[in-house]
């Protein structure tokens, strides 16, 4: 289960439907029976369908999910249907559409990246960062999971990842690695290196995961060879500019994990909302 509370979805409804739908009220159609069918116009990996259904239910309509999040849907395949008053459906249909369009786009981009990476190296995994647009973390992460990715970091509180901006505040990071492992025995210690020599030194000092930022696939391949020579169990992550076009190259280079924010940004999927009288 991926938990998204009703309170979050209700807050999204309230952003658009403050009190009433004035157009529906002016037309006098609030109580006219209505039906809604939703489908992607082109092939995609669906996401956000369950949340769209919940939004419709919160407004008082009945909603039925026909194709779940994570489904590779053909264009024109109906994924969600709803029935209820025109007032209920018109009040939230645009929000339901937005949730599915943005979520399905994230899932589709994620699926393309994962497919490319694992075709080149079945052992490589893809993980998404916390660099989603503020306020969209739950929907963004659920969509990325639907596309086959894992989660790099939920936030600052679930993992230890040391960047250069942390190290400039310390006297000697290398000497702190062993102490950090003692102080947090249930947590892996991860660090991002500025260059190969720095990364190898961190691995020799005991970090569990080493993140390589914006290195070429050729540079990464050489680094992986040297890193695994020091510690065969170390996890090497490639980050910075990872997308579906270069995922295969970085996977072939031997990255254990491809860390990406790319999936969050791009054109929404086109989801058609088809109305009829009930």
What are these regions (language model features)?
Residues 242, 248-257, 276-278:
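Ligand-binding grooves and catalytic loops that recognize ribose/phosphate and carbohydrate rings
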């Amino acid at each position: 289960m991926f938990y998204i509370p009703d309170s979050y979805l209700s807050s999204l409804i309230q952003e658009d439907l403050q009190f009433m739908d004035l157009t529906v009220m002016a037309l006098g159609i609030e109580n006219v029976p209505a039906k809604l069918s939703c489908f992607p116009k082109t092939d995609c990996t669906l996401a956000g369908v369950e949340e769209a259904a919940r939004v419709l239910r919160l407004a008082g309509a009945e909603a039925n999910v026909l194709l779940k999040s994570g489904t590779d849907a053909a264009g024109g395949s109906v994924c969600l249907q709803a029935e209820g008053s025109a007032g209920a459906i018109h009040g939230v249909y645009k929000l339901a559409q937005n949730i599915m369009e943005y979520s399905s786009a994230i899932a589709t981009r994620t699926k393309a990246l994962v497919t490319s990476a694992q075709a080149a190296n079945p052992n490589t995994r893809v993980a998404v960062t916390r660099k989603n647009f503020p306020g969209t973390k739950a929907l963004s992460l659920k969509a990325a999971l639907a596309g086959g990715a894992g989660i790099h970091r939920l936030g600052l509180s679930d993992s230890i990842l040391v960047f250069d901006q942390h190290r400039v505040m310390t006297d000697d990071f290398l000497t702190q690695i062993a102490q950090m492992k003692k102080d947090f025995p249930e947590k892996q210690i991860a660090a991002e290196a500025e260059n190969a020599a720095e990364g190898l030194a961190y691995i020799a000092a005991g970090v569990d995961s080493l993140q390589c930022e914006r290195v070429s696939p050729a540079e990464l391949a050489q680094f992986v060879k040297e890193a695994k020579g020091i510690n065969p169990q170390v996890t090497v992550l490639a980050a910075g500019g990872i997308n579906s076009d270069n995922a295969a190259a970085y996977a072939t280079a031997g990255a254990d994990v491809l860390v990406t924010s790319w999936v969050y940004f791009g054109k929404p999927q086109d989801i058609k909302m088809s109305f009829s009288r009930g």
